[in-house]
């Protein structure tokens, strides 16, 4: 090996000298060109040899790595005696990395466990605080209900009270602004009246008749005189008249703008009120709480220009007449507006009641039962009924023993009752909860007298079936009667008679009669 290397070294040294010195037989120029070409060719061959050697060395290195790995696996198998140890064997540095990763994961797990414990403790605190607030709200509801003297089973809604309080506060602020505006107008009129009186006292009768306050007639006369050719003379009096006219018109425009602004504010308040009520109704509809105590539905009845209102209380007790499921109130006799809460009902929506003769005769309700609620639903027909004063109420379920109180009383008693209840409605303004105890006492006193009228009710029940009766708002039942087979002419005649009776009742003083007469079922 050493001899071969020595011979190779001698040969390479000889070639190197020949390349440097060149062939002595050639001229110097040719000698340099031959040397450069030979050097380039030799360098290329040398590069090829080196690249081949590099590939061979890389292949041998890969083979050596494979042999080392196989040898390590064989040694590990011999030590542990496990055939599957090859998949679990790691070098020392890889084991260190795995241990470090495991420690970091353990630290993260401990941190997450601590945060979970903290979140659990916070959740328990929040739940305890929520329970405390719920109990506090329940106690406040009970206390407020006890203070207001309401029914024990009808807990008041604090949110509803707050909403009503906000609405009343806004209306109060608006009314105060309107009062201030009216006061300013009154002061203006007073100043104009005083100036006119002073002119009369000091003898200034020739002064202008125009003041800061002008009526529409004065403005019209002044403008018509200008149009007819009677122009005002250019004097100080005419100039003052025109100035006062312009001032009065400007003040009138300002007042109109104030009125429009107040009207817009009123519309905004009413819109917010309607939106709050719609949100509350939507919440009740989603949660399925339509049958809670205290929920009422005011449904209008088409009575021509007059609109009566039926209040359907879904879940009130039967024991008191102020908490019955049907109330007919002529609230729209005072104004053409109607309040509709609960389900949406239009102005022309008709509410109709088709009762059979057996149901009309056996329609008395036992008022001494304390445990049952009205659970019947009523389908409201959307057909507008203008000439018919009272339409059909169709119960969806079959009416059992606890149904609506239908009383066929005498015509004179019902007329006096309607007059009395109409006057009470105008005075009370729809506050039927304040007169509950009085109506209950009156019912207890009237229960003894009703026994004497039971025979008359049976005999006159057929004659009074087709007569619609408008009932009270102060918490008592009225006589609801309807005929199953009625022609259009009879309904028209009844509506005309009803309007005349209402007109006579508005002028006649109310009689001192009982607000309710109950007729037992035949």
Curated annotation (Swiss-Prot):
The keyword Ribosomal protein appears for this protein: no
Keywords recorded for this protein, A-Z: Coiled coil
Comp. bias (Polar residues): 429-438, 467-490, 503-522
InterPro entries, per database record: Coiled-coil_dom-contain_pr_149
Coiled-coil segments: 1-196, 260-287
A Pfam family this chain is assigned to: CC149
Family according to the record: Belongs to the CCDC149 family.
The protein's name: Coiled-coil domain-containing protein 149-B
Classification of source organism: Eukaryota, Metazoa, Chordata, Craniata, Vertebrata
